[in-house]
Amino acid sequence: MQFGIFTVGDVTTDPTTGRTPTEAERVKAMVTIALKAEEVGLDVFATGEHHNPPFVASSPTTMLGYIAAKTDRLILSTSTTLITTNDPVKIAEDFAMLQHLADGRVDLMMGRGNTGPVYPWFGQDIRQGIPLALENYNLLHRLWREDVVDWEGKFRTPLQGFTSTPRPLDGVPPFVWHGSIRSPEIAEQAAFYGDGFFHNNIFWPATHTKKLISLYRRRFEHYGHGRAEQAVVGLGGQVFMRKNSQDAVREFRPYFDHHPLMGGGPSLEEYMDQTPLTVGSPQQVIDRTLAFRDSFGHYQRQLFNVDGVGTPLKTVLEQIDILGEEVVPVLREEFAAGRPAHVPDAPTHASLLSARVAANTSAATTG
């Protein structure tokens, strides 16, 4: 089981002080968050991708490459790579380059994002969002697996005898998660390729999230990649912790009330009851996270969002310390104890390379 942090890279005013960090401060804070995640023993840091204010995460591979040079163990990922508006050729080359720089500590999450205007900014039509996602990923999948590609589609110029460079490290493409919060077509796509499926698990009730994950699991088995319970699932979650729940709720309430997506509707208490948001003690976060397994089955990756509401960096780092010291060690033990032997771990470069070598050896022996 992998545990980590995911961020969307927003620049948000702290409602308790009225201070808004500069873009430079926010970019550097994201790096600091990643370094803290490795320091406390977490496994993954994932950054989003946005091309509009109030976000600064416009170039994920630039940031992840910088973090790669400062870390040794952390898996570097994205909480969204925009498969709809990025050229698949550029994605193939950028993430292969990052693989080489990070010695394979790379995977990525494909998504369509949640900002409609980004489509025309990059010359695309939002009404074609799903077809774009399907076609672009089909090309990306081939670019990483075929040395020479001839390709023609609807949304970009054809390719003739094209080779993307550098080639994936050790001939092993980065593992891909397909992220979606509402689109069954994306769950179907993840299942078709035998890739992972990730739900951010923040704003939606468990009944909604369960429908998409269950669809993905059924279709994963349908396409012959393994049993439904062997499908590779990742979840997000938003948490805020203090030693006791009363202090956590008191401190977090102004951030909730002033948040553009959460404030102004249900109360904090109602929101926590209706969604996976957990504000309370470390034990409450442990209990809530373990309950995800009851709702969605055994899964492979749990990422927490701890920085998305304007909380100052000092507070964010305190949250990561609590995760590393009090929450994740318990979760690792509890998730491992109940995990059937046939349920796989999250793929890594090392495990994918080992599987590739084994497959090649088997083919050579039988051939």
Describe each model-derived feature in a short phrase.
Residues M1-L76, P173, V343-D345, R356-T361:
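N-terminal beta1-alpha1-beta2 module of alpha/beta enzyme domains
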Residues E185-A191, G196, T209-F220, G224-M262:
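Aromatic-lined glycan-binding groove of carbohydrate-active enzymes
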Residues T16, D87-D195, K210, S214, ...:
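Internal, glycine-rich beta/alpha segment that forms the wall or movable "lid"
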Residues F3, G41, E49, I67, ...:
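Conserved, mostly hydrophobic/aromatic
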Residues F3-T7, F45-T47, L76-T78, V106-M110, ...:
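Hydrophobic faces of well-ordered beta-strands that scaffold small-molecule active sites
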Residues V44-I67, L82, N114, N201-W204, ...:
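Glycine-rich, proline-tolerant flexible connector loops at the mouths of alpha/beta enzymes
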Residues D14-V27, T81-V89, V172-R182, D273-P282:
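Active-site mouth loops of central-metabolism enzymes
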Residues M1-P21, T115-V118, T157-V172, G263-Q274, ...:
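N-terminal small/glycine-rich loop or linker at the start of catalytic domains
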